[in-house]
């Protein structure tokens, strides 16, 4: 987490405590090397490290890739908690259904081009989008 605070370490210890509150597993595993953590735990460390700079925008590229369904749900809950802190989140995610559930706005790409866009709940409830991308 300290690596993520390299830009501004004025409140390093308080920021670390905030990350421990947001991601309790990190506090529990703080004496382990990141390479010894599970994929989901490493993702939480990566997100917490990015949050150490107190960003206005957090960019996430496939945050749930390679994690179990249980951990995926947990990661999306963390994303919702971050969103509540008024941090804008730009996320690329293959799990369209869960991503749209937590999104204010969504964009669906087809062969690299924007095919659909709108509010997350609108896209989730669109019959054609559900059939083509969300399994019906």
Model-derived features: where do they sit?
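ABC-type ATPase nucleotide-binding domains, specifically the catalytic core motifs of the NBD
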Residues: 1-14, 22-24, 136
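Conserved ABC ATPase signature
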Residues: 33-37, 41
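ABC ATPase C-loop
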Residues: 50-51
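Conserved catalytic motifs of ABC-family nucleotide-binding domains
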Residues: 54
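Catalytic Walker B motif of ABC-type/P-loop ATPase nucleotide-binding domains
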Residues: 58-62
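Helical segment within the ABC ATPase nucleotide-binding domain
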Residues: 73-85
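Short, glycine/charged-rich "phosphate-handling" switch motifs in NTP-dependent
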Residues: 105, 117
